[in-house]
Amino acid sequence: KEARVGIERRQIEEDTSKNIHTDSESLLNFNRASIPLIEIISKPEIKNQEEAYAYLTTLRERLKYTKISDVSMELGSLRCDANVSVRVKGDTELGTRTETKNLNSFKAVVRAIEYETARQIEIIENGGRIVQETRLWDEENGITRPMRSKEESMDYRYFPEPDLPRVHISENRLAAVEKEMPEFSEDKVVRFIAEYKIPEYDAGILSGEIELAAYYEKVTKTSGDAKLSSNWVLTEVLRILKEKNISIEEFSVSPE
């Protein structure tokens, strides 16, 4: 099943710090202070946690394949907040939303959305009212906790930076950029199946990371046996990468 999710806007910001929350305290990590970042605001068109996961993995792939970012949540180069709202079946307007932070993995995003959806449904079914607020994901207990109420929070009054000129992108420039786009994973899967005659499952794993896909193709070119190369990469190579906790770029065996 395919789903289409629009992007409301992208905005350039400057990183300030990273919040790290524990049961007893909240810490601030300033290691990334002043580093530029891009915030991508998605339209409220994601219907459930499964669609959210699919959207995030696709977005992460696009950002990595185009070398915009290494998109590592562990290193702080990718972060995600989840806005959740529910509505009674038949209603046309979205319900009051909450924003959940402290999500350190895509699996945490899925669990947080699932929990927050169930929490809001229970409140409404019991005659209660959803409060617009920011909540924190408690990974250990699998719940969200209130952080601050947005109904009482300061109005930051966002406005465009007047000292930065507007950038106008022409249709010709857009067309040129589209031609420079790399081959994304879904296209690689189709090509790997057709060209190398490997199963769809194998093609999906091999094309999941651009560096792994490139490594596999070099091994195949060297060995002359696409299936044997696929089996070796998927078993021996990935096993060693997992055991040593390294990336394919750090792997000591040359594909040639």
Task: Indicate residue ranges for each PLM-predicted region.
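SsDNA-processing nucleotidyl-transfer enzymes
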Residues: 1-33
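Charged, compositionally biased, marginally structured helical/coil segments
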Residues: 22, 28-45, 50-256
